Amino acid sequence: MKAKHQRLILAVAALCGVAGAGVLAASALRDEAAYFRTPVEIAGGKAAVGEAMRLGGMVAKGSIVRQADGLTIRFVATDGQASVPVEYTGIVPDLFGEESGMIADGRMRADGTFVADRILAKHDERYMPPQMGEMPKNMKAAVEG
C-alpha cells in the first residue's frame, strides 16, 4: 500500500473514532438535559406532565411544610408572578430556606405539583462560607482569587 493510501485510511479511521465518541457523549447527555422553567412558564402551560426539567425561583415565605417522615418537604416556588407547589424527599441544602433562591430538578405531576429529585440552593455573589469568616482578610483575598 502506498503512503498516500495509508494516510487516507488513518484519517478516515480517526474521523470515525471522533464521530463515534461524539455519538456516545450525546446519548449519555440526553438523559441529563433538562429545560429550565420558571413558575410563570409552568403556569402558562409550557411544561408537559412527566417532562424532565429544572424549576427555578424563590421559596415562598411561610410555604415550607415538613412531613412526619422527616425527609419529605413541600413548599411553593415563586417568581413573583406565579407559584408552583413542589414536593421533595431527601436532605435539603443548608442554604435552603424561605425567601431564598432555589433550582429543583424533577418532573411535573398531573395534579400540578412539581416532584423534585434534587434541590440546589442559590446564593448571591456576596455569600461567604462560615469557615471563611474566621480567616484573616489577606488569606480571603488569596483564596477568592
Swiss-Prot record:
Its membrane topology is listed as:
Single-pass type II membrane protein
The UniProt GO MF terms for this protein read: heme binding; metal ion binding
Main localization, broad class: membrane
Any single Gene Ontology cellular-component annotation? plasma membrane
Q: Which UniProt keywords apply?
A: Cell inner membrane, Cell membrane, Cytochrome c-type biogenesis, Heme, Iron, Membrane, Metal-binding, Signal-anchor, Transmembrane, Transmembrane helix
Q: Which GO terms describe its biological process?
A: cytochrome complex assembly
Q: Cellular location of this protein?
A: Cell inner membrane
Checking Pfam families in the record gives: CcmE
Query: Residues that bind heme, according to the entry?
Result: H123, Y127
Q: Which residues lie on this side of the membrane: Cytoplasmic?
A: 1-7
Q: Which residues lie on this side of the membrane: Periplasmic?
A: 29-145
Write down the Gene3D superfamilies for this protein, in alphabetical order: Nucleic acid-binding proteins (2.40.50.140)
Q: State which residue ranges cross the membrane.
A: 8-28
The family classification in the record reads:
Belongs to the CcmE/CycJ family.
Q: Tell me, what does this protein do in biology?
A: Heme chaperone required for the biogenesis of c-type cytochromes. Transiently binds heme delivered by CcmC and transfers the heme to apo-cytochromes in a process facilitated by CcmF and CcmH.
Q: What is this protein called?
A: Cytochrome c-type biogenesis protein CcmE
Which species does this protein come from?
Sphingopyxis alaskensis (strain DSM 13593 / LMG 18877 / RB2256) (Sphingomonas alaskensis)
Its gene is ccmE
